[in-house]
Amino acid sequence: MNKRKPDWLKIKLQGAEKSHEVKDMLKRLSLHTVCEEANCPNLIECFGRKTATFMILGSVCTRNCTFCNVTKGLTQAVDAEEPSNVAQAVKELGLKHVVITSVTRDDLPDGGAGHFAKVIEKLRPTEVIVEVLIPDFQGDREALDTVIRAKPHILNHNIETVPRLYATVRPKASYARSLELLKNSKELDPGIFTKSGIMVGLGEQEEEVIAVLQDLRAVDCDLLTIGQYLAPSAKHHPVIEYIHPELFKKYKDVAYEMGFKYVASDPLVRSSYHAADVSHIIG
């Protein structure tokens, strides 16, 4: 698709000066953010507000999703200092809500679940709301339980797209497995808030998106994000369509009618964009 981006996807650059402070701190503490690795369009705004989504377990992924800009290839050794460094970064930024995500580490026996737990445990003594955005751990319920037992406030796992597109968009993932993870999360801890997200503009149909929302509610998913897919480069899955803001509003209205507790649906929404907006729900 060669069509130019519509006006509603144009971003005002603000907060650039403060964003350098965040980048300097991340470098000092040897930390990665999904904001940088995924080439997020909201990076300057979020860094300018001194918020970030920390990406643990290195910067190299074992999966080959065609929508993602994170580096694929040979993985790195797990940094034992990372949990302490994340906690220090959260303290320096004065965060009230922190999002921790990771590359997918299919090469690790537990998929990195134990490392997630260590990061959460370092943050739990603070007042910060801890949200984790986790991979599917290849369906390993024990790995999921390891994360759940560490007591994050929000368990996020993105469904990403409609089932029909998984073969081309997420070839190593499974729609059913992702739904099962969200279902199991509630079974392991009924009090945890679960969250998921979907990208649109990949070639899905409106009725397919509605069906995904129904599937998410069927496993008692609480929080939802819907955003426009933007291809990081010409080598990635192409943008098939730029979805009009009115359709995002429709998805939002439909989702609330289904019973989601919080819905962010807008072209520039990303999974952790303005994540702290749910703080009034978490309590």
From Swiss-Prot:
Pathway noted in the entry: Protein modification; protein lipoylation via endogenous pathway; protein N(6)-(lipoyl)lysine from octanoyl-[acyl-carrier-protein]: step 2/2
UniProt domain Radical SAM core: residue ranges: 47-261
Broad EC category: transferase
Record text on cofactor binding: Binds 2 [4Fe-4S] clusters per subunit. One cluster is coordinated with 3 cysteines and an exchangeable S-adenosyl-L-methionine.
Binding site for [4Fe-4S] cluster 1: C35, C40, C46, S272
Catalysed reaction equations from the record: [[Fe-S] cluster scaffold protein carrying a second [4Fe-4S](2+) cluster] + N(6)-octanoyl-L-lysyl-[protein] + 2 oxidized [2Fe-2S]-[ferredoxin] + 2 S-adenosyl-L-methionine + 4 H(+) = [[Fe-S] cluster scaffold protein] + N(6)-[(R)-dihydrolipoyl]-L-lysyl-[protein] + 4 Fe(3+) + 2 hydrogen sulfide + 2 5'-deoxyadenosine + 2 L-methionine + 2 reduced [2Fe-2S]-[ferredoxin]
Similarity-based family: Belongs to the radical SAM superfamily. Lipoyl synthase family.
Family matches, as HAMAP family: Lipoyl_synth (MF_00206)
Name under which the protein is recorded: Lipoyl synthase
Source organism: Desulforamulus reducens (strain ATCC BAA-1160 / DSM 100696 / MI-1)
Gene expressing this chain: lipA
